[in-house]
């Protein structure tokens, strides 16, 4: 299914501005634009709605798996027995069949996260729930930072939704040779990462790192570490809390990934150049 919805600009009585120098006047022309679809997606565990988030409606099974792992709802992929994506009134339900042990724990957390766009603190009742006490990551990988420029090119070229709409974030998983293994896109940067982590959960032997097109927030660091991935690279900056958490989890965190440059915040032992 094509989840990109096309609207003619004339329908909305708007014009796409196009500058042309002609007799010192500005001309305008009607143009058709691609808009990224954004819909409410409810994650329903064992028949009970847990959260509603605004998402791009694709790769939703990956989203459910990645969100469940990163939020600590499940301990391993096999704790989910089944995932069904079902159209609902004005949105989509992702119905997740969860192991009883995990469902009992989920109900005890008493989280109400309706209306989120991917921010993990919204709806959390206790501040202790924000800062997860994760074990330090082992150091099992090394990456040649000289390969980063090629990774950035691959990431940009693979962003189909981003190229067509200009309004989505992307998260990519690269192996240690710098090859793009998977890319996920979404209107929300955290959701794009959740979708990627859901894919990664099905590839237990995959060694590599995550590259995202956004800043590195504390929650993105936490999600990455919770899924056992040792390195997160962001195109924009990291926040102070993200750096502090990366140090605690012994995760390699890199920001300002641009052509010919990068800022290493933590975990330089996994990098060489």
UniProtKB/Swiss-Prot annotation:
The keyword Cell cycle does not apply. The keyword Cytoplasm applies. GO terms for biological process: Mo-molybdopterin cofactor biosynthetic process. One of its GO terms (cellular component) is cytoplasm. Pfam families: FdhD-NarQ. Keywords: Cytoplasm, Molybdenum cofactor biosynthesis. One of its GO terms (molecular function) is sulfur carrier activity. Mo-bis(molybdopterin guanine dinucleotide) binds at residues 256-261. The active site is at 119 (cysteine persulfide intermediate). Its main location: cytoplasm. It is found in: Cytoplasm. It comes from the Bacteria. InterPro entries: Cytidine_deaminase-like, FdhD. Required for formate dehydrogenase (FDH) activity. Acts as a sulfur carrier protein that transfers sulfur from IscS to the molybdenum cofactor prior to its insertion into FDH. Belongs to the FdhD family. This is Sulfur carrier protein FdhD.
